[in-house]
Structures are given as structure tokens and as C-alpha cells.
């Protein structure tokens, strides 16, 4: 590790092979917690590159648990977290609506690292087994069209990184890697990103990983979700081309919702918010959800525009389809 630390301290980027070799050692528990923390902090200070992110993703996928069935049409809408917005679990709520729209959702997630409640914490309150076996996950993806992919189950060696991440308590390259290291080879992706300046780097990584189409979204104040105030910036990967765009709530004909209106709470409180949205109860939470679902339908290609996606999201919530997806997942992912 000494040579690696020297290179990082000189602000020299690492190659994919170098990073993959380091993470192979980390995932075999051959690197101390203090060294892992130093490595993550060093990359953050230096600035992460596409090659470094890809190297970690490759290492994680090579150590990941494999599902017994192969799915080639799946999507994930997991974000990086780490935006310090303390909003409710937007992408977790949105995934049920996206699944109701006919998209096979392999929703990755974890327990809370830097917020009150991670997606795993909320789903656990709702009776979903976040530590379900690969066989059950395959069944859920097949029968429900939706499964929650718990990082600690599919990436058991991640337990060697967790303590260092918890000790640092700030976003690191692992926040970027998490949504990209889905054990399934995703066809499409919506990824929330807490730093707008990293969008192009992440888009290049996603392209290297073979995604057909993807959107990387950063909301106002560097939220890792789209929001109904200020300007949202997204990078679109489509047909091998990468382009950046912006939009506001006004562009979509929607009402303004301040960040303070979508604050979440602990896992139990966020589970109640999720249920209220899927029951179509009018609120800022509902409006923010349909915005992000609309963006998800656009990212997948199911909607030609974000506005069309928002309209589809409203229909799927209003007719109970999204709530039914939750009920079915509660029956299968147990």
C-alpha cells in the first residue's frame, strides 16, 4: 500500500488494474481499517477518476454473490446518497412505481451511512427481507418484476470496508461505486449523484460497464435526486453519446416544493411516507416521487420525455398498481 499512498499523495491517478488489485486485497481482508480509510480519503482529496471507479466495480463484481437466473433487462434507480439533504427515501419509493410501469427493477441499496434511514432500513420496517437469498431474489425479479438487492448480501466482502466508511462518516468513492456495482448486468440506469462535477466521469464509467441507456441526475444544492425547486442537471447516455441537460419544475408544469417540505425521519417515519405516496395521498412527497419516477421512465426509454414519464407515474399510483407491487414484494421477498 505504501507505493499506492505515495502515488495518491502526489495527486497521480491510479489505473484500473492498480485499483482492482488494491480492492482484491481489501475484499480478502488483507488491508487494515486505517489503511482503507486513508485510501478512500486520499482518492476523495485527489479527485476520483472513471478508471478508478471502474477498477473498484470490477473487483466488487468478481467477489459478488451470483443470482441463479440471468436477467438482461433490469434497471436500477439507486443513488449515491451522501448529499446531506436528509430527505425521505425517494428512490426506494419510486422503484415500486417504476416496476408497476413494467420495468424489471433490481433496486440496490444499503443501510444508512450518512443519513437517518437507508433504503434497507425502510424496507425492513415494511416487512421485506433485505437479506433474502439469491434464489428468493431471482424469484422476486421473475414473479414481481422487482427485487431489493441488499449490498451486504450480494457483496459479503463489503463488510471489510464498512467500518472505515462509518468512521469517516462522509461521502467517498464508495458512494459512487455502490449504484454501479449491481451484481446484475443492468440494461438501463437512473443514478442520483451528489456532485454535479462528477457526472461526466460517472457517465463514462457507466458506458464502460455496458449500459444501453442511463441518466445521471444531480438536483439543486447537489441533491442526489431531482427536486421541485432550483435547477436539476442530468447527463444522458444514449446510443453511445453523452450529453448534459438541465430542467426546472416550471419546465414540467409542476408546483414548487422546497427541500424543507420533503425532509424524512427515521426508518419508521420514512416507511409511513412511502406508504402515503403509494396510496396517492396528496403531499410534497408525492410530487417529488412522481418527478423522480418520470425521470426514471425517461432514463429507461419507456417515456419519450420527463413530462410524459411524470404523467405515467401519476396514473400508476392513482390506479393502485404501485401499491400492489409493494404488496407482492412483501409476499415474495421474505
Curated annotation (Swiss-Prot):
GO terms for cellular component: cytosol. Pfam families: Glycos_trans_3N, Glycos_transf_3. It comes from the Bacteria. Its cofactor is Mg(2+). Anthranilate 2 binds at residue 165. InterPro entries: Anthranilate_Pribosyl_Tfrase (IPR005940), Glycosyl_Trfase_fam3 (IPR000312), Glycosyl_Trfase_fam3_N_dom (IPR017459), Glycosyl_Trfase_fam3_N_dom_sf (IPR036320), Nuc_phospho_transferase (IPR035902). SUPFAM superfamilies: Nucleoside phosphorylase/phosphoribosyltransferase catalytic domain, Nucleoside phosphorylase/phosphoribosyltransferase N-terminal domain. Anthranilate 1 binds at residues 79, 110. Mg(2+) 1 binds at residues 91, 225. Gene3D superfamilies: Nucleoside phosphorylase/phosphoribosyltransferase catalytic domain (3.40.1030.10), Transferase, Pyrimidine Nucleoside Phosphorylase, Chain C (1.20.970.10). GO terms for biological process: L-tryptophan biosynthetic process. Binds 2 magnesium ions per monomer. It catalyses: N-(5-phospho-beta-D-ribosyl)anthranilate + diphosphate = 5-phospho-alpha-D-ribose 1-diphosphate + anthranilate. Keywords: Amino-acid biosynthesis, Aromatic amino acid biosynthesis, Glycosyltransferase, Magnesium, Metal-binding, Transferase, Tryptophan biosynthesis. Its EC number is 2.4.2.18. 5-phospho-alpha-D-ribose 1-diphosphate binds at residues 79, 82-83, 87, 89-92, 107-115, 119. Mg(2+) 2 binds at residues 224-225. Pathway: Amino-acid biosynthesis; L-tryptophan biosynthesis; L-tryptophan from chorismate: step 2/5. GO terms for molecular function: anthranilate phosphoribosyltransferase activity; magnesium ion binding. Catalyzes the transfer of the phosphoribosyl group of 5-phosphorylribose-1-pyrophosphate (PRPP) to anthranilate to yield N-(5'-phosphoribosyl)-anthranilate (PRA). Belongs to the anthranilate phosphoribosyltransferase family. PANTHER family: ANTHRANILATE PHOSPHORIBOSYLTRANSFERASE (PTHR43285:SF2). Homodimer. This is Anthranilate phosphoribosyltransferase. It comes from Streptococcus thermophilus (strain CNRZ 1066). The gene is trpD.
Amino acid at each position: 500500500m505504501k507505493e499506492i499512498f505515495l502515488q495518491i499523495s502526489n495527486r497521480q491517478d491510479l489505473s484500473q488494474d492498480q485499483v482492482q488489485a488494491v480492492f482484491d486485497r481489501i475484499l480478502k481482508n488483507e488491508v487494515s481499517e486505517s489503511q482503507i480509510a486513508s485510501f478512500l480519503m486520499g482518492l476523495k482529496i485527489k479527485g476520483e477518476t472513471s478508471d478508478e471507479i471502474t477498477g473498484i466495480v470490477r473487483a466488487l463484481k468478481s467477489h459478488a454473490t451470483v443470482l441463479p437466473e440471468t436477467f438482461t433487462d433490469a434497471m436500477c434507480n439507486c443513488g449515491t446518497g451522501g448529499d446531506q439533504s436528509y430527505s425521505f427515501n425517494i428512490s426506494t419509493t419510486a422503484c415500486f412505481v417504476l416496476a408497476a410501469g413494467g420495468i424489471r427493477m433490481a433496486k440496490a441499496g444499503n443501510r444508512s451511512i450518512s443519513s437517518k434511514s437507508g433504503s434497507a432500513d425502510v424496507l425492513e420496517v415494511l416487512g421485506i427481507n433485505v437479506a433474502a437469498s439469491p434464489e428468493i431474489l431471482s424469484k422476486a425479479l421473475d414473479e414481481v418484476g422487482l427485487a431489493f438487492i441488499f449490498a451486504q448480501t450480494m457483496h459479503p466482502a463489503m463488510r471489510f470496508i464498512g467500518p472505515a466508511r462509518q468512521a469517516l462518516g462522509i461521502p467517498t468513492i464508495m458512494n459512487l461505486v455502490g449504484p454501479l456495482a449491481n451484481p446484475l448486468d443492468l440494461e438501463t440506469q437512473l443514478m442520483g449523484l451528489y456532485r454535479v462535477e462528477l457526472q461526466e466521469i460517472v457517465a463514462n464509467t457507466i458506458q464502460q460497464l455496458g449500459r444501453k441507456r442511463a441518466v445521471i441526475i444531480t438536483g439543486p444544492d447537489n441533491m442526489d435526486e431531482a427536486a421541485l425547486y432550483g435547477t436539476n442537471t442530468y447527463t444522458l447516455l444514449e446510443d453511445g453519446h453523452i450529453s448534459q441537460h438541465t430542467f426546472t419544475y416550471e419546465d414540467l408544469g409542476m408546483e414548487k416544493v422546497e427541500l424543507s417540505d420533503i425532509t424524512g425521519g427515521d426508518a419508521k417515519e420514512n416507511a409511513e411516507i412511502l406508504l402515503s405516496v403509494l396510496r396517492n395521498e396528496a403531499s410534497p412527497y408525492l410530487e417529488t416521487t412522481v418527478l423522480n419516477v418520470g425521470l426514471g421512465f425517461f432514463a429507461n426509454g419507456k417515456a419519450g420525455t420527463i413530462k410524459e414519464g411524470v404523467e405515467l407515474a401519476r396514473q400508476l399510483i392513482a390506479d393502485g398498481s404501485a401499491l400492489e407491487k409493494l404488496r407482492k414484494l412483501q409476499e415474495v421477498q421474505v
